[in-house]
Amino acid sequence: LIKNGEIKILRDSLHQTESVLEEQRRSHFLLEQEKTQALSDKEKEFSKKLQSLQSELQFKDAEMNELRTKLQTSERANKLAAPSVSHVSPRKNPSVVIKPEACSPQFGKTSFPTKESFSANMSLPHPCQTESGYKPLVGREDSKTHSLRGDSIKQEEAQKSFVDSWRQRSNTQGSILINLLLKQPLIPGSSLSLCHLLSSSSESPAGTPLQPPGFGSTLAGMSGLRTTGSQDGSFSLSALREAQNLAFTGLNLVARNECSRDGDPAEGGRRAFPLCQLPGAVHFLPLVQFFIGLHCQALQDLAAAKRSGAPGDSPTHSSRVSSGVETNPEDSVRILEGFSVTALSILQHLVCHSGAVVSLLLSRVGADSAAGEGNGSLVHRFSDGDMTSAPRGVADDQGQHPLLKMLLHLLAFSSAATGHLQASVLTQCLKVLVKLAENTSSDFLPRFQCVFQVLPKCLSPETPLPGMVLAVELLSLLADHDQLAPQLCSHSDCLLLLLYMYITSRPDRVASETQWLQLEQEVVWLLSKLGVQSPLPLVTGSNCQCNVEVVRALTVMLHRQWLTVRRAGGPPRTDQQRRTVRCLRDTVLLLHGLSQKDKLFIMHCVEVLHQYDQVMPGVSMLIRGLPDVTDCEEAALDDLCAAETDVDDPELECG
């Protein structure tokens, strides 16, 4: 009888654990479904706005073509009908009524045409003529000849306008990308844009709108260094001009090429809409790589100068003196940071809109064959010899694209530096990596293996909170692959442990409470994803110190979320409050899963006992009062509240 009772208890416990796991899976599925639905709604809204803008653009284009056609027709009419007009003047003959809509360009017209007028404009326009029934006998033969000529001319113009209209319609994505790239400024708070990168050189006079002070001397000094240090001069003025010419070519190609969706890594990925190829966007990469590489080289020079103790002893200083240009390494870094942030912003737009750029950055084949159009050699030339002092492991993979190497190199440098601009560099690097991982398929995610060697520096206490949120988003994307998920806790610097310590300590004193809640929600959803996908969840499946810290971190996050909901008062009304309640429920399920799998769960709760005792009754009352509370959540709350009483015994023994 006793054995049967034990078996029954074990069977009930097993069923309860399975039901909790099933609830976690269902909760994760619902969360992913909500995210997918929200993303789908945003995509639909964006698609509607895009169609509206496209329609307005077509109407405006048709209006411009109409004005251009009327202007050309009017000029030809004035030349051909000059003799007849001299005999019959409209002023002297009031019976001649000229249509101003058909014979004169309407320069004052600013409104868009209606759909009916737009459809009428797409048909063959009528020749410029007087009102029927009022044409005088004088010059009738000349008018017939002019009518035939005008009819053929306008037919050609209408056909050309029709072709231009279809070309514009098929290249909407290219137009969006060009508009984003030409935005001034590219980043709020910055004065730089793509125009500055296309117009910058050491030959431009300093102080001009497109030439910031000190950039010319910095570029000349770097050019002298690279010319003496390498045979090809990766940062020479000729290389900059070549990169700028390629970028101009890329602008033209993106504006003219049709949107192709064949063979890009994003196909079959997690996007609701396939990513356009836009192969012309690849031509921007040499210019982006030039300024990112220039910034990396300046950071290396500054590190060498600090190691030597005196800037005058550094090889950079001597090379710049020999080139006749004096530039302090710190000044060079400060000048180039703004250009680097602008280049990273351009790269982010390219990764968001061009499948060809995503394919090239993640390709393991030579850039010469992937880039095409003769720009692959330039891409390689910019990177050869520039990664000699990169952090260990960053530049080891020879199969990486050179620009991806530089991006990781710059990410490692900016993680260890301080300052507002360096924080912007770190944030922009992570934004590029997040978009790159988001726009690629699961088959290409193993190419992000190299990122794990740099991420420990990004999760340090010195990292600002926006950068930490982006790092967690990147980890959540990489955790979708079975090969990458175990590596979150497989290095000497455990990424999960660093993340837990950052959350419990809250080192960023400038960040707002809303930003901290966003980070905590991202972490909870990351742990929920890991707990559902892995047969031995990473949160409890190793002997790492993160097994202890995860209990503390989840308890602290649960306490903060509960305080936020309690301060709001009443049921959740806003989307932010509903997300907080959803995150609180997921945190409860995570804690319950830990209590079932971690034999030392009670001991691990001792350090946060006061918060655990305070939060569990309030959380239990809050969740049980929700209309959609589930049986698994009630069972989890029962177990956690029972564990609360068990925690008191070790506490008393310690006392």
From Swiss-Prot:
A motif (EEXXXDL motif) lies at residues 633-640. Phosphorylated by ATR. InterPro entries: ATRIP. Keywords: Coiled coil, DNA damage, DNA repair, Nucleus, Phosphoprotein. Residues 315-326 have a biased composition (Polar residues). One of its GO terms (cellular component) is nucleus. Required for checkpoint signaling after DNA damage. Required for ATR expression, possibly by stabilizing the protein. This is ATR-interacting protein. It comes from Macaca fascicularis. The lineage of its organism: Eukaryota, Metazoa, Chordata, Craniata, Vertebrata. The gene is ATRIP.
